[in-house]
């Protein structure tokens, strides 16, 4: 019986020195390099883009540079008084269950009063969010907003090479190119595919090859899983 390697869902590495720069994130990185000299009066920056474009990883680059505190929720005005940090990161920022509009209005006033800064990460620009509180709406529309687009080919190729290298896998350039041209263009998909391809290669006891990659990236993976379990798939 063929032993199947455990499916390990390794968390993405957000080490700041592992962040790879490219055309899609170049301007966002320039904004971070300009910190703390962000536009007054609130000195806040909104980086927005689709899921998996690298916003969270970029926030760790900012955290290392600024020592910012991660603020995961702000529901009540009374919480403002307990904020001891001056610089903040608000990841996955949405004005719903975790952040109330009234509390955020006072949060921006707090930033202006203390000379603090805030990095807000969201899928859409905060300037385009549906805000009922007019005073908060005006504040969100006054802060700098920078989009991160889906990664271009070169950036995605570099990221895939590094992900495989982190798993001690050396993968031919042609295989990387095939992946880039046949996958969804985001880092979340890249993490998932690399993990699945690594597992498939370990199961087959062979190095990562184009044949293995094609099998993993097939729309119907049921046949692949069945063959690996029964050890009768030639790769």
Language-model segments: residues:
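Post-Walker A helix-loop "phosphate-sensing" segment adjacent to the P-loop in P-loop NTPases
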Residues: 63-74
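Walker A/P-loop nucleotide-binding motif
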Residues: 40-58
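Conserved nucleotide-sensing/catalytic segment adjacent to the nucleotide-binding pocket
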Residues: 81-122
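Short regulatory helix/loop adjacent to the ATP-binding pocket of P-loop NTPases
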Residues: 126-141
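Conserved AAA+ ATPase "SRH/arginine-finger" region at the nucleotide-binding site
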Residues: 143-155
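A short, basic N-terminal segment
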Residues: 1-34, 202-235
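The conserved phosphate-sensing helix
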Residues: 183-197
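Short conserved motifs of the RecA-like P-loop NTPase core
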Residues: 170-182
């Amino acid at each position: 019986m063929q032993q199947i390697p455990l499916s390990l869902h390794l968390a993405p590495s957000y080490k700041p020195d592992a962040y790879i720069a490219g055309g899609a994130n170049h301007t966002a990185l320039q904004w971070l390099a300009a910190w703390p000299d962000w536009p007054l009066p609130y000195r806040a920056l909104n980086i927005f883009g689709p899921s998996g474009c690298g916003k969270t990883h970029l926030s760790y680059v900012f955290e290392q540079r600024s020592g910012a505190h991660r603020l995961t929720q702000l529901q009540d005005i009374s919480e403002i008084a307990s904020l001891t940090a001056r610089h903040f990161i608000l990841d996955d920022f949405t004005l719903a269950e975790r952040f109330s509009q009234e509390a955020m209005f006072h949060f921006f006033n707090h930033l202006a009063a203390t000379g603090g800064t805030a990095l807000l990460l969201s899928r859409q620009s905060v300037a385009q969010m549906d805000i009922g509180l007019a005073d908060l709406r005006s504040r969100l529309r006054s802060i700098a907003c920078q989009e991160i687009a889906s990664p271009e080919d070169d950036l995605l190729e570099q990221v895939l090479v590094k992900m495989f290298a982190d798993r001690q896998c050396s993968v031919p350039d042609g295989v990387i190119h095939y992946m880039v041209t046949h996958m969804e263009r985001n880092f979340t998909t890249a993490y998932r595919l690399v993990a699945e391809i690594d597992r498939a290669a370990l199961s087959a006891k062979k190095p990562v090859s184009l044949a293995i990659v094609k099998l993993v990236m097939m729309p119907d993976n049921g046949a692949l899983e069945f063959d690996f379990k029964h050890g009768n798939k030639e790769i």
